[in-house]
Amino acid sequence: MKPFQVHLFGEEGKIPESVPPEPSFIYGNKRYLNFLHFDCLHLKNSEYLKETARMNIEAEGIVPTDARAGIMGSLQDEMSEVKHIESLLFFPDEVSMMFALMSIFGPKTTFFIDYETSTSLINVLQYRRIEYYDFHDLDRLRKLLSDHAEKVMFVDGIYEWLGNIAPANNIVKLARESECIIIANELNSFGLLGREGRGFVDLCNLYEDINIDIGSFSKFLGGFGCYLGAKKYLINKIRENIGYITDFVPQFMLSVNLAGLEIIKEKTKSKNVYNKLWKNSRYLITNLKQMGLETVSETPLVVVSFSNNEEAGEFTRRLIDEQIIAAQKKERIRLCVSVEHSKEDLDFCLNKFEVIGNALGIIKT
């Protein structure tokens, strides 16, 4: 824990815009628990990743990466082993990656996305032909699929504002029966699910069923940007459509991504880390449920649902007053559990949830 002394609370009762990427921090002589960031494995401030970036900058500077650079080849080889990806493109953010992906689909293509999917997907696809589906109602999804010819199915790994794992096998089965192009959305699951964080495609053994794989290095691996993986002919087509967008990325970013993959591939060490992380999340989820709070979460992204936006907003403000930082969206509050959170930290958090829940009449004792 570092003694960060930053200006966090510009307006009383609001979640601060800039919170240090630490599971806990000191502000105003008070210790705050930070559940805001996706950095569940606590790699954002990894000394190994910092040293990797520093050494690469000293050797290569911050010049953009040429597609033929050695580091790109190394990352390609590593991702080929980890994700079974034949070819790869790297992008600085989710939006640019999504726009590049959309370049290979025509105006008549219908995109099927879950109501609970990533916000970046919804933002980019809002001007395309979209059919929303609910993973609870696969019969309706089957009917929707039968009504369209050119179609693409986005399949999620983890729903970031529910905290549960998607029924990917069932959704993929329907998509294959309907001759959909299937895109695995690993933006919220790469680095967290599957063997050594290989993602939900690995967890559900869907390697042979997926046409395109998209994911993020920045959420759980302490790295930068996003990847887009597919067969070589598709990647070549995307590259033709977008020109040299992917070349404007400093090499040190790719070196950090490669180092992050090396960390999670250290089987003995990573196994202990993942076991502790999932033990922490199960402990928190179990106790929240025992209080009578509503959650369907089954991952380290723990989401609690309330009756309405106002109730969740008031709960979030009171959590800040009790030295707990959490994210809120509408009627939901999300806690991103870190491997660095101790049992005492989780007990402190649970106690504050109970105190606030009782004060607001949400928990009935």
What is the meaning of each model-derived region?
Residues 2-62:
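N-terminal "arm"/small-domain region of PLP-dependent enzymes with the aminotransferase-like
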Residues 54-93, 281:
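Conserved N-terminal alpha-helix of the aminotransferase class I/II PLP-enzyme fold
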Residues 135-184:
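Active-site phosphate-binding strand-loop segment of PLP-dependent enzymes
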